[in-house]
A protein has these predicted regions:
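Extended intrinsically disordered or low-complexity regions, especially N/C-terminal cytosolic tails and loops
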Residues: 1-241, 253-356
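Acidic/aromatic/glycine-rich contiguous surface patches that form carbohydrate-binding/processing clefts
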Residues: 249
Length: 356
């Protein structure tokens, strides 16, 4: 009788286990269907899908992860950093959610620092442009606007042969018209200078992309003291994507481990060499777009910012971020690629503003 009861209990247990397996498989199939159609996942679905992909919750519990995803960030942002981790047969073998959340925090600090660095560069270059144009006896502040506009127009027509010239909007009109709304911060400047604005007004209102193009125009056209802008002419364009990612709160550490993405500039390669980055690591990681662009940003900041105090402030902030990377170093013990990036970035930062 006891043997019969034991057999029945085992059978019931097997049936229950089979039902659970079927239920889990059905739930996973449902989640995968949502993912493939780029649909919305609930918090429970997000956790289940991460577990399916091999992401563990050893450093942060599943409940804590749900709180983090609902209060601090969102799924697609924090999981973007998983792309820095290798997969085996489509699944992660050494990735914990704690590492993802830690990278997201480090990324936040880095974005804030990069914005400050870029604002320093942008302001200094605008001030330098106004200064050299003011000092030049060949410039009246208005002729250069016409020259720049003609340059932009010719370049547009060259790049887009089918573009109708009658649809072209002059540079000064384009820049000034962005500020014509009465509730805008620069409306007063617009009303006073909207017709025939001088170059110093346009420089003040230029976007970062427009500033890059104007620096290139100034250099290419052999303007007064153009050699002052040689580093900016070569490197400024490389900082734009990094600056935009930081300004719009997009992850900057995404794909930071990828190698040989670009052919790096000689300036960035030399900077890394002087920082003590070994040849193999230079070849592998200075060719990463974001590491390369970060180096370009540091070179420009060191070149154009004259205040040692400002440079020291930025270096201290970046050094604190590098030190923050080691706060949970045990999360990264199996992440050789990320450790390598950390080592390279530490050397690069140490080479910036060595007076500090």
């Amino acid at each position: 009788m006891k043997n019969n009861n034991s057999k029945k209990s085992a059978q019931i247990g097997n049936i229950s286990s089979n039902k659970t397996t079927v239920s889990n498989s059905s739930n996973l199939a449902r989640i995968q269907k949502i993912v493939s159609s780029h649909g919305k996942l609930s918090l429970d679905d997000q956790i289940a899908y991460m577990k399916h992909k091999g992401i563990t919750f050893n450093h942060i519990t599943e409940d804590a992860a749900k709180d983090y995803l609902s209060q601090n960030t969102y799924y697609y942002k924090v999981t973007a950093f998983r792309k820095n981790i290798a997969k085996i047969n489509g699944k992660y073998t050494s990735l914990d959610f704690g590492l993802l959340s830690d990278l997201a925090t480090i990324d936040m600090y880095l974005r804030y620092a990069l914005i400050k660095i870029n604002l320093d560069i942008e302001h200094t270059l605008k001030a330098l442009l106004v200064s050299v144009i003011t000092k030049s006896n060949a410039e009246d502040g208005y002729t250069i606007v016409k020259e720049y506009d003609m340059c932009c127009k010719n370049k547009l027509l060259e790049e887009k042969p089918k573009f109708k010239e009658k649809n072209y909007i002059p540079v000064d009109k384009k820049i000034m018209s962005r500020n014509k709304k009465i509730d805008g911060y620069h409306y007063d400047l617009y009303t006073k200078r909207k017709n025939n604005p001088p170059i110093w007004v346009l420089i003040e209102l230029m976007s970062f992309g427009e500033l890059i193009r104007f620096v290139e125009f100034y250099y290419d056209n052999n303007k007064y003291n153009k050699n002052l802008f040689t580093p900016a002419f070569i490197l400024l364009k490389y900082t734009k994507n990094l600056r935009d990612s930081a300004a719009h709160s997009r992850p900057v550490l995404l794909d930071i481990v990828l190698q040989k993405q670009i052919q790096p500039t000689q300036n960035a390669t030399e900077f890394a060499k002087n920082a003590g980055v070994e040849k193999l690591e230079r070849h592998a990681l200075v060719s990463n777009k974001k590491i390369h662009d970060f180096i370009c940003m540091l070179i420009l900041h060191d070149k154009y910012i004259k205040s040692d105090a400002m440079k020291s402030d930025r270096k201290i902030e970046l050094t604190n971020i590098i030190e923050r990377c080691t706060k949970r170093s045990h999360y990264y013990k199996d992440q050789a690629d990320l450790i390598r990036v950390y080592r390279v970035l530490s050397k690069i930062l140490a080479n910036y503003h060595q007076k500090c």
